[in-house]
């Protein structure tokens, strides 16, 4: 019997990699529902191949999608719109597995809906957990949802932890003999740039990651090290560990995806070629393993692996994220919202590369922190933070 999969963000890089794995295992998985924000022509081709029962697009894309469906004689797929549609498919009774791969805050409500419906949730949308934190984790416990990390680093940590670690007490302290988490970072494309060189970075340069094939937003986040900051926050929530037990290690080759240190002096690492199909396949099948077409690591090819500390003077975003996690409450929501606005402005060439962390820092300083008591107050603060960030960008000439 096949398991039914819903892919939120099917036309993105994670969505496409997920389809690649599902296509290799039609005896195990079927696609029930998909969503896309853009690339409607690509979405139609996906629908022709995988024949989902339901598709969700933004309201303004409905006419385009239905027109293309009519041209292709596709009449057996239901079309839904907007956030309501996303929540519907993420929590649908016929869905077993939800791939949460919508980028940014837009993925929060459908991801939370999947968790509250008790689904197996493959979490690729780190921003959803950065914003909702313990609300998301408590919902997973309350509804017996299985929240499995797809980010290569968190998936590596998950594989390197004791098998029952997620069931351990959530104290903020390392449990079951764990002493520290080592979160690896490639360092991005500008690892060896000077501060002066960083002021001249273009969006095109920032979107070219040296090791991974990713979307624009996450590529820019990787270049500023904000991606690693968001991943630090995600790790703290997923594994119930305080931020000072998480050390970021720059590892330019992206072969070791993260490590876990233990009290007996052991360090366990998960290694592999940098291909998102591996963590996706792991999360899909855990505790079993799926065959993929990712080649096994050739250790003779990588005779030297390098490690260094991150330069937080050149890349202040990492410390901003650590400070936001330490502050708790709504600070991570403010951080994430301001960063999304700043990255968007950078991609539109309204601000420079080094202005991205400045926008985030200004927004964090401008807004008062408070407890994250509900999803409603998180969404309210997200909206306010976006407005403050936009105003600041306008004030500096963006």
From Swiss-Prot:
Protein residues bound to Mn(2+): 151, 153, 231
Pathway where this protein functions = Isoprenoid biosynthesis; isopentenyl diphosphate biosynthesis via DXP pathway; isopentenyl diphosphate from 1-deoxy-D-xylulose 5-phosphate: step 1/6
Q: Biological process (GO) annotations? A: isopentenyl diphosphate biosynthetic process, methylerythritol 4-phosphate pathway involved in terpenoid biosynthetic process
Q: What is the lineage of its organism?
A: Bacteria, Pseudomonadati, Pseudomonadota, Gammaproteobacteria, Moraxellales
Does this UniProt record's set of keywords contain Oxidoreductase? yes
State the protein's name.
1-deoxy-D-xylulose 5-phosphate reductoisomerase
Q: HAMAP family annotated for this entry?
A: DXP_reductoisom
Function description: Catalyzes the NADPH-dependent rearrangement and reduction of 1-deoxy-D-xylulose-5-phosphate (DXP) to 2-C-methyl-D-erythritol 4-phosphate (MEP).
Question: Pfam families, from UniProt?
Answer: DXP_redisom_C, DXP_reductoisom, DXPR_C
Q: Can you tell me which residues bind NADPH?
A: 11-14, 125, 127, 215
Cite the EC number: 1.1.1.267
- Annotated family: Belongs to the DXR family.
Keyword annotations from UniProtKB, A to Z:
Isoprene biosynthesis, Manganese, Metal-binding, NADP, Oxidoreductase
Which reactions is this enzyme annotated as catalysing?
2-C-methyl-D-erythritol 4-phosphate + NADP(+) = 1-deoxy-D-xylulose 5-phosphate + NADPH + H(+)
């Amino acid at each position: 019997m096949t398991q039914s999969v819903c892919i939120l963000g099917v036309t993105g890089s994670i969505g496409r990699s997920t389809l690649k794995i599902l296509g290799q295992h039609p005896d195990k998985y079927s696609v029930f529902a998909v969503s896309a924000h853009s690339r409607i022509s690509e979405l139609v081709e996906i629908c022709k191949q995988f024949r989902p029962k339901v598709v969700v697009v933004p309201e303004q894309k409905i006419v385009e999608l239905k027109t293309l469906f009519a041209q292709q004689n596709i009449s057996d797929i239901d079309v839904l719109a907007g956030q309501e549609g996303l929540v519907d498919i993420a929590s649908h009774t016929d869905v077993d597995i939800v791939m949460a791969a919508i980028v940014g805050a837009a993925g929060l409500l459908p991801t939370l809906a999947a968790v509250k419906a008790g689904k197996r949730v493959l979490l690729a949308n780190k921003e959803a957990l950065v914003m909702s934190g313990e609300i998301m984790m408590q919902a997973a416990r309350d509804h017996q949802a299985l929240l499995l990390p797809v980010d290569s680093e968190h998936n590596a940590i998950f594989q390197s932890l004791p098998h029952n670690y997620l069931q351990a007490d959530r104290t903020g302290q390392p449990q079951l003999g764990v002493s520290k988490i080592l979160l690896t970072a490639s360092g991005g494309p500008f690892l060896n740039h000077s501060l002066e060189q960083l002021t001249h970075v273009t969006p095109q340069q920032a979107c070219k990651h040296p090791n991974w094939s990713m979307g624009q937003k996450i590529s820019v986040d990787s270049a500023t090290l904000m991606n690693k900051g968001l991943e630090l926050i995600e790790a703290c929530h997923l594994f119930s560990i305080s931020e000072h037990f998480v050390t970021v290690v720059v590892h330019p080759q992206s072969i070791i995806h993260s490590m876990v240190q233990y009290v007996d002096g052991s360090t366990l690492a998960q290694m592999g070629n940098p291909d998102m199909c591996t963590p996706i396949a792991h999360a899909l099948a855990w505790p079993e393993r799926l065959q993929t077409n990712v080649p096994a690591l050739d250790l003779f090819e990588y005779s030297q692996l390098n490690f260094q500390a991150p330069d937080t003077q050149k890349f202040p975003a990492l410390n901003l994220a650590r400070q936001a996690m330490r502050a708790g409450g709504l600070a991570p929501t403010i951080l994430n919202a301001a960063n999304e606005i700043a990255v968007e402005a950078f991609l539109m060439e309204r601000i420079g590369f080094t202005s991205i962390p400045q926008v985030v820092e200004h927004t964090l300083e401008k807004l008062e922190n408070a407890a994250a008591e509900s999803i409603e107050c998180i969404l309210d603060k997200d909206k306010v933070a976006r407005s403050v960030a936009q105003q600041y960008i306008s004030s500096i000439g963006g």
